[in-house]
């Protein structure tokens, strides 16, 4: 019987050290997730957690013709024949949760989440059937400064984790009237060459016209480049809104580029849409994206409420950090006590608890190996500090702590050592 995982999923494991799989090390994930929590807290966003599965109808609202709904959802019937779906994206679930808690709804609702998503993706680099998304939803306010604020938050997150060569690509899809005018122009443009488009784009021509612009098929690129720009169809009010957002990005020093071909893969987006991309030479790929979805709450049975949000795939963020040579440590600042005999065992057990109460992450090596082997294990496992305790240390009450990264030591009485460790941990 094979214990191998199904395709498209993976373990986030604490002891991974091989370069190929280092991105799966749980210490890296904790650091990136901590940055997301910290930045969202600074901007006044609160965490939300929705169920792993919901009624299928919740996710149909993202668009019956979107790739997610048509091809990628994990849907099943429960024992009573009810259709349920594993969460493929966060926005629809958050909107559903907000409406379910309507008594607690505010005029300005600010949520973020770090949750697994499930999609039946084609097997390729950077895509997984269970992936993890850092997402944010701001529901209730329509203002160009809100859009700029959310983009600023996202930019601060990328800076906090150490991503480089980032740029925001933006477009403006407009509301229903703008989209109707643009759809008419786009349909007329593609009609004369419809049989030369890829099969997928021919299908989208009849079901979801705008998504042709998102095609990666080689035979479509010539036509996409020549297609009308939606920016020629937005009215003065939309243009003023778009310009106001761009002015704030410029003031914040956030590099951006206008991409009139940019659309999103879900049908609920309106007005401003964006992708955050990393650009290295001629190669670029998205590390997140989102935009405004002012009609989704009403389409979900709620009041008319404007909204703006984004989603960031954490797998790709962590992989990119490592590709860019970011020196992410897979270890935490931790002390390992190594008792050399049974008498030291009891002291180490007691002292470890005292150190933890002081805020010092402390573990005890109970193996009673030879000191040389215990020190080698500590070095291999990237332990920050090591303290060997035997008969002499207990008799003199003088302890030596080795700093494994600096290859230096400091020593002193118990209280002095504790104060030094607290300082080292707080100033790491």
From Swiss-Prot:
EC number(s) reported in the record: 6.1.1.21
Self-association and partners: Homodimer.
CDD domains: HisRS-like_core
Catalysed conversion reaction: tRNA(His) + L-histidine + ATP = L-histidyl-tRNA(His) + AMP + diphosphate + H(+)
Disulfide bonds: none
Domain of life: Bacteria
Coiled coil (UniProt feature): none
Location(s) in or outside the cell: Cytoplasm
Main location: cytoplasm
Similarity remark: Belongs to the class-II aminoacyl-tRNA synthetase family.
Any one biological process term the GO annotation gives: histidyl-tRNA aminoacylation
GO CC list: cytoplasm
Keywords tagged on the record: Aminoacyl-tRNA synthetase, ATP-binding, Cytoplasm, Ligase, Nucleotide-binding, Protein biosynthesis
This protein's record includes keyword Protein biosynthesis: yes
Protein name stated in the entry: Histidine--tRNA ligase
HAMAP family xrefs: His_tRNA_synth
UniProt lineage: Bacteria, Pseudomonadati, Chlamydiota, Chlamydiia, Chlamydiales
Cross-referenced NCBIfam families: hisS
């Amino acid at each position: 019987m094979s214990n191998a995982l199904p395709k498209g999923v993976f373990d986030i494991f604490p002891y991974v050290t091989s370069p190929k799989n280092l991105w799966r090390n749980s210490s890296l994930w904790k650091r990136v997730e901590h940055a997301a929590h910290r930045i969202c807290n600074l901007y006044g966003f609160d965490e939300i957690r929705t169920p792993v599965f919901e009624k299928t109808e919740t996710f149909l609202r993202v668009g019956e013709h979107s790739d997610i709904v048509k091809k990628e959802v994990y849907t099943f019937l429960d024992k009573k024949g009810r259709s349920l779906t594993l969460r493929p994206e966060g926005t629809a679930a958050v909107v559903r949760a907000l409406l379910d808690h309507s008594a607690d709804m505010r005029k300005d609702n600010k949520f973020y989440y770090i949750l697994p998503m499930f999609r039946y993706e084609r097997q390729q680099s950077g895509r997984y059937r269970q992936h993890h998304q850092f997402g944010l939803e701001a529901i209730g306010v329509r203002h160009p400064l809100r859009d700029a604020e959310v983009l600023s938050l996202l930019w601060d997150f990328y800076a906090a984790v150490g991503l480089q060569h980032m740029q925001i690509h933006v477009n403006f899809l407009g509301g229903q009237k703008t989209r109707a005018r643009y759809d008419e122009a786009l349909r007329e443009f593609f009609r004369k060459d419809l049989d030369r488009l890829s099969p997928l784009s021919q299908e989208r021509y009849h079901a979801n016209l705008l998504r042709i612009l998102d095609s990666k098929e080689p035979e479509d690129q010539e036509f996409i480049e020549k297609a009308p720009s939606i920016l020629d169809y937005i009215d003065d009010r939309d243009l003023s809104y778009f310009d106001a957002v761009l002015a704030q990005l410029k003031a914040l020093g956030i590099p951006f580029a206008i991409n009139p071909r940019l659309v999103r893969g879900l049908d609920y987006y309106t007005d401003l849409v964006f992708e955050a991309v990393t650009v290295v030479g001629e190669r670029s790929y998205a590390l997140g994206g989102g935009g405004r979805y002012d009609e989704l709450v009403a389409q979900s049975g709620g009041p008319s409420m404007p909204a703006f949000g984004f989603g960031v795939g954490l797998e790709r963020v962590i992989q990119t950090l490592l590709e860019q040579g970011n020196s992410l440590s897979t270890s935490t600042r931790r002390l390992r006590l190594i008792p050399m005999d049974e008498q030291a065992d009891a002291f180490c057990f007691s002292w470890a608890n005292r150190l933890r109460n002081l805020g010092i992450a402390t573990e005890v090596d109970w193996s009673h190996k030879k000191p040389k082997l215990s020190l080698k294990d500590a070095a291999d496992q990237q332990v920050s500090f090591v303290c060997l305790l035997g008969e002499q240390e207990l008799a003199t009450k003088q302890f030596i702590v080795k700093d494994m990264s600096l290859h230096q030591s400091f020593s002193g009485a118990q209280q002095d050592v504790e104060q030094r460790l607290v300082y080292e941990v707080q100033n790491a």
